[in-house]
Amino acid sequence: TRNTGSARGCLKVEIIEGRDLDVASQTLSHPYAVLQFEKNEYIGKHVSKAAVGSNPAWNETAAFDVTMENRSLHLSVYDRIGDTEELIGACEIFPRLFHQSTTKRWYTLYLLKEDAEEQVKRGEVHIQTTYERLPLRKLSPRDFELLKLIGRGTFGRVFQVRKKDTKRIYA
């Protein structure tokens, strides 16, 4: 599959909750999720009383442009206590990229032990993915919100912009 440069669709990922996460402290740990899809990243930094301990409730949503087929979504969950962060575990998700398809399920997090080649189960995360195919069209300046001027030169001006539908920031 080749990259056409324009979005074929939009993948919405809801990070609902975690279950039995292997955290360092039930009262001090603030686990959060990081999603990576097609070189774009979402870092869940939502801190609430419900996102503490081994069974956090996040209820966060990220949106990604889909430009290529057969891409995986990488999920990592980290344990934050104060200024320290440690990887709890990760998994690879292969979302269904069919128009108006929604999948809601629990995904198991694994961590590779340093001294062995075995993966250790480190908890589960409840994820919902929804895919919407977009009509084929070229992006225009109206699809973006100007944030600030970054640079100026013989090449023209470079702006920092936010894509209106996914809220992603680009330069």
Roles of regions detected by a PLM:
Residues Y131-L146:
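A short, low-complexity linker immediately N-terminal to eukaryotic Hanks-type protein kinase catalytic domains
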